[in-house]
Amino acid sequence: GPRGVGKTTSARIFARAINGFEVADEAMAFNVFGLDAASNNKVEDIRSIVEQVRIPPQKGQYKVYIIDEVHMLSQAAFNAFLKTLEEPPPHAVFILATTEKHKILPTILSRCQIFDFHRISVPDAVAHLQNIASQEGVTAEEEALHVIAQKADGALRDALSMFDQLVAFAGKKLTYKAVTEQLHVLDHDTYFTLTDQALASDIPGAMLLFNEVMSRGFDAHHFITGWASHLRNLMVAKDPQTLQLLEVTEDVQSKFQDQSS
């Protein structure tokens, strides 16, 4: 699955579950091994794991080996790993996490049970951020959380990192204005204004708005791309059947409906 959607976190929860939650955390630390294949992709790195696999766990039933970014392993490392995957000891469980499944050898894939993770939708990310804000005593405007979720582009880990940074910067009250300024993103009103100017053939007004946006340090390409997304949202808002595709708050959704009509 894509980055930041909980693959490694799910792997650690799974490792905890199959060993039973009654096992102490200190004991579990010896049963779970992590390897970042992006920086440990040589044959020697895999062989060190293969040697450890033979030793049964002291407490709990399983030893769990979590290999992140497994597609980064070299061909020789994959080959060294293959025999162990074919005939693993009964106490060993391997969890392979990757963002690029197509790069993994078919001989490896055929020996695995595959779970596909998907990008986190904006409403789900917003709901999770609202829950965290409530637990941490942070007051956050819904539209501000929508901006964070959209900026994260389906990666909840990125959304949480941005949320932490914004709370450190803006304090316990997150406003839409503070979030857009800190994340350096244009608000919806800019695109609504530009579209109104275009529909009214107000070329001077549009040029002045564009100049203002450039003077604030925004990239012209991103500005045009953002406007293209805005126009796409207007087409989506014209039909009640496609309205659910708009990943915005109800207030902004109403603005899209008004402008599209």
List the predicted regions and their residue ranges.
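P-loop/Walker A NTP-binding region and its immediately flanking N-terminal helices
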Residues: G1-I114, D124, I132
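Extended, largely alpha-helical regulatory/partner-binding modules appended to the mid-to-C-terminal parts
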Residues: A11-R16, D45-S48, Q113-S261
